[in-house]
Amino acid sequence: MKFVLLFGVLLVTFFSYSSAEMLDDFDQADEDELLSLIEKGEARAKECTPRFYDCSHDRHSCCRSELFKDVCTCFYPEGGDNEVCTCQQPKHLKYMEKAADKAKKFGGKIKKWFG
């Protein structure tokens, strides 16, 4: 019985070691591929579209604000037949950024008080 238990522990140890080595090999291959893409310049992102500018040419090109990425919002202006798309920040994300800024400022004051 002790022999079976010892054999089982050794088998599990060997299996976990071999699977960890395989994962390391996969990670190394991914890193090499990423480095080659960066060297070629293929991974470089194109320029983003600023807030309130037209994003109809590429709806995923809106810039990031401090915490969140702006969203390309499309609508029909009153009395118009053409769809207009602009990069905008949703209100709930705007409020979350304001709350985060206030919390950051308050944390700075507390740090200043208690040094």
Swiss-Prot record:
Highest taxon, organism lineage: Eukaryota
Disulfide cross-links: 48-63, 55-72, 62-87, 74-85
Propeptide, residue positions: 21-44
Residues annotated as signal peptide: 1-20
Any one cellular-component term (Gene Ontology): extracellular region
InterPro entries, A to Z: Spider_toxin_CSTX_Knottin_CS (IPR011142)
Ranges in a coiled coil: none
Secreted recorded as keyword: yes
UniProt GO MF annotations: toxin activity
UniProt entry keywords in alphabetical sequence: Disulfide bond, Knottin, Secreted, Signal, Toxin
Family the entry assigns: Belongs to the neurotoxin 19 (CSTX) family. 01 subfamily.
Domain notes: The presence of a 'disulfide through disulfide knot' structurally defines this protein as a knottin.
Name of this protein: U3-lycotoxin-Ls1a
Taxonomic source organism: Lycosa singoriensis
